[in-house]
Amino acid sequence: MSYERKYAEALSRVIGEELTIDQIEALIEKPKHEAHGDLAFPCFQLAKAYRKAPVMIATDIANELNDELFTKVEAAGPYVNVFLSRDVVSKEIINTVLEEKSEYATHEARNETIVTDFSSPNIAKPFSMGHLRSTVIGNAINQIARKNGYDVVGVNHLGDWGTQFGKLMVAYKKWGDEEAVRANPIAELLKLYVHFHEEAKTQPELEDEGRAWFKKLEDGDAEATELWQWFRDESLKEFQKVYDLLGVKFESFNGEAFYNDKMGRVVEMLEAKNLLVESEGAMVVSLEEENLPPCLIKKKDGATLYATRDLAAAIYRYETYNFVQANYVVGGEQALHFKQLFSVLRKLGYDFVDGMHHVPFGLILQEGKKMSTRKGRIVLLEEVLKEAIEKAQANIEQKNPDLANAQDVARMVGVGAVVFHDLKNERINNIEFDLDSMLKFEGETGPYVQYTNARANSLLRKGNYDGSPFTGADDDYSWGVVTMLNAFPHVITRAHERREPSIISRYVLDLAQAFNKYYGHVRVLEEDAGKQSRLALVKAVTLVLTEGLRLLGVEAPEEM
């Protein structure tokens, strides 16, 4: 139970029935200055019922309030401020962390499911830096949802359908080499695709051939289907290398193609509700009442569109997983598409749409410009991660040349630096990409938090921590750490409610800072009766830092 809750219960005993415990708890604040105590309750809402000025009410409550949890209660104007007993609270919090370990701040299972659609690269195209944000934000949102007690289904809605596959088939049959594709699938398929477009400038009939092959694929032709499946399988193997580096897993790889046989039903439903209208030969759903442009369902030639497929996917996911929430971690430029999608689902009478959220994010910039190409070529995410690992290895060799598992640590630090940097600020902001600054061991970086955790683990080894409990402390530096550890459950809840991983990034930075301040002022390893208790505090910090980083998709090496 939180201390806000405990304070609310103590206040309730004095206030009586004017406010419920929940209402009291919602009003409790944290004073801006330490001198004003740990928690504050404003009395304005009681003025009408008590027919007194809030200042007088605060004085009355302060005089009556007593609990072993508080060392001091004072009225400060219209506020009742309490000072928590550092000894009681610190023992309770740190020993709870030590007992629950990585389960600290984990909610009980809710038996409710959240579906998150994220990453979703296009088959036969490079996995570029452009896919980093959706992948790491979606992964963190899922980990945080699990911590909050939800079952989670991560969906990689692959771009595995479309006329480009017809073109690719023509290119492969004319100029392709099976061995070359197997050796380097994405680069080879991209080369063939680019070559097709070059040739089509002088041979426009190639476009017709491409359309014909895609038609064969749509009609279930065996050769076309086999080629498509092969392109998809080879691409996925390549993508998997990146997912393995990032430690990202999915429960479903159902991409666009999966919904081919499910779109007809959507069109029938729209027709049955008289929602389809003709517009310049195409079929659309009018969203005039919602002040949105019409949603295109079928093109002139009868081909279904992106929106039709997403409608089919949303309905399928609800019918399959019975989700309470569905997140789409997709760039901000798709905002209109999702407004239209949710509006059409609402018109179809689906109330599950209330739990659907577009989770947008900003761009990755380099020197202020969109980072998608380097010297005219696409920046591959795998290349960037490998470069980060190499740079991390160089930093580690300089700092700790004798480190036993240096390669493994370099991978954790290099990849962790890239992921942490992406999740450090609110996701809606653009991020400036600079590998050297994000790999620094000081400042607001992943390596700073990882290094703090490694330093704490080193103290535990040097001090031979024996698993003893924490016996209490009332100095300011210990208290700074304790209040941070106490905040973790609240941080977990807030990060989930806002679908905002940066709340956890900020938290682990603040906890690392509080610990480094403690480490700088308290002689942790001094051989006296309190040593094992001090190490218990250090152990609690390592547990929470490691878990906080894990939720972001960042590993925490014990040595660096």
From Swiss-Prot:
Xref: CDD domains: Anticodon_Ia_Arg, ArgRS_core
Signal sequence annotation: none
Catalytic reaction list: tRNA(Arg) + L-arginine + ATP = L-arginyl-tRNA(Arg) + AMP + diphosphate
Residues spanned by motif 'HIGH' region: 121-131
SMART domains, per the entry: Arg_tRNA_synt_N, DALR_1
Keyword terms: Aminoacyl-tRNA synthetase, ATP-binding, Cytoplasm, Ligase, Nucleotide-binding, Protein biosynthesis
The EC number(s) this enzyme carries: 6.1.1.19
Subunit structure: Monomer.
Name of the protein in question: Arginine--tRNA ligase
Organism expressing this protein natively: Exiguobacterium sp. (strain ATCC BAA-1283 / AT1b)
Gene: argS
